Amino acid sequence: MLNDTDTIQRYPLRHPANTNLHLHYGEAFEGFLIQSEVGPFIREYLSDLKRTIDLALAEYPRVLAYRVDLRLPQGVDLPDFAYTNQVISRFFESFTKKIQYHQERVAERGYSRGCKVRYVWSREIGQGGRQHYHLLILLNRDAYYTIGRLGSDRVNMISRIEESWAGALGLPVDLMTGLVHIPKNAEYLIDRVKRQGKGDELADLFYRASYLCKKATKSYGDRQRGFATS
């Protein structure tokens, strides 16, 4: 029979590389299912994810949420900041400005609904030490109801993301092929008040986004954050 010491050794309560972070085990968090097969998770990250979604729904009754992955190019000389958190800060600064600019333009025609950009990101180190970012972006669905189509000639959410990532890396936008990845079924339409006969996309979203909160493949001790929210 396991005693308390055995249990703690088998299931540590704190992250061994950052004891400020607490580990979360199990299949759910505050009533939402999570991807337990990739756990354990960082409890603080799960809390921040839920808080960010709650803030978006508190501000807007209808929210468009979607997943994006950003990668660094190989075989290309990049500035030193590309390997630090500065690059993702530059990305969101550019992306937010693009949304603000678009809302200002549509406001001139009397159509602006307003849109605060909210987000969650995680920085992970993959095979061969390759750094990449997983993102969840949340927008006012009365302002933006879809992310658009990859490769479209029209300006859409994907083209704004590509331009912002190119600018963050200091590269031409035509080199973004393969560096901006939109996962399958990336979009989630969530409502403050669940509509009758509509599936629970909020629960689906939290399950999907819980992947960003997992302990594995994050780097600590390099003075760079592995996770942040707006």
Q: Language-model features: where?
A:
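Short, solvent-exposed secondary-structure capping/transition elements
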Residues: 77-79, 104, 129-131, 142-149
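Histidine-centered divalent-metal-coordination microenvironment in nucleic-acid enzymes
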Residues: 118-144
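Catalytic "initiation/cleavage/transfer" segments centered on a nucleophilic residue
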Residues: 2-8, 12-20, 29-60, 141-230
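Signature for HUH/AEP ssDNA processing cores
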Residues: 53-119, 125
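A structural signal for short, well-ordered beta-strand segments and their strand-loop junctions
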Residues: 67, 132, 174-178
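Short intrinsically disordered coil segments
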Residues: 82-85, 136, 150-153
